[in-house]
Design a protein with these regions (language model features):
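Catalytic cores of carbohydrate-active enzymes across secretory and cytosolic contexts
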Residues: 1-242
Length: 242
């Protein structure tokens, strides 16, 4: 969801973003075969100011896109009843491993990527759908083979559901597809507080399309009810049993 690359590039909120940014910088320095996926945020995270009363207040402002190059790749993710087409940008500075950011093409869909960590439940699920489902589709469209997926916190968990759905569509059953997927996913979580371990109503996950045609019973097996993104990540990782 966030990458702390430079203070001029408003794609991070705090420590998780700094960690992800350092990861990408180190991978670039070492020449490791790593590719990052994120979203291009119009307003980034809040810019705080201190008011005359001494209290902090949030301010939101639109930022220029930054050092981005259009790859020409477009991917689609169905969010509820709307097909959201996303362009795929490549970050072109900061000496990092390849990093691609998705952004809706149609301005009517950019409410999804307006603000990092938008608290509205539907918006947050939609953000994580573009990151996870859209991210998998972007990697395919870029013809980048993937040996291992790393979900850093639960935000990218819907990528796992997309991969399960792909295996089912190819003729597999749910449990076999889920078991096979575990060998391709590692999961890390760093925020042992409720705010860092998102829970969504399973009805919202299903209604918005994040379940990728999986039925509610299958979604419950992965993330519980309500759907816990961290639990889903833990259950989908290598040797994941919970």
């Amino acid at each position: 969801m966030e990458y702390g690359l430079h203070e001029e590039f408003h794609s991070y909120a705090g420590g998780l973003g700094v960690l992800a940014g350092d990861f990408m910088k180190s991978a670039g320095d070492l020449g490791l075969p790593v590719v990052g996926i994120g979203l291009r945020w119009a307003q980034g995270y809040t810019a705080q100011r201190i008011g005359p009363d001494g209290y902090p207040y949030d301010e939101w402002r639109d930022y220029p896109p930054g050092p981005l190059t259009d790859t020409g790749i477009r991917v689609r993710v169905r969010v509820a009843a709307r097909e959201v087409e996303c362009c795929v940008w490549r970050v072109g500075r900061y000496a990092i491993a390849p990093l691609f950011l998705l952004e809706p093409v149609d301005v009517r869909d950019r409410w999804i990527t307006r603000r990092l960590y938008d608290p509205a439940p539907d918006c947050r699920v939609a953000q994580e759908m573009l990151l996870g489902i859209g991210g998998v589709r972007a990697l395919r469209a870029l013809h980048l083979p993937v040996d291992l997926y790393h979900f850093n916190e639960g935000h990218a968990v819907f990528a796992g559901i997309e991969l399960i759905a792909d295996r089912i569509e190819a003729g597999g059953d749910f449990h076999t597809a889920w078991e096979e997927l575990r060998e391709k996913i590692v999961f890390t979580t760093h925020t042992p507080v409720p705010a860092g371990n998102e829970i969504h109503a399973i009805e919202d996950v299903h209604r918005l399309g994040a379940g990728c045609e999986l039925v509610k019973a299958e979604l419950r097996e992965i993330g519980g009810n309500p759907f816990n993104m961290t639990v889903a990540g833990l259950r989908s990782r290598r040797s994941g049993r919970l």
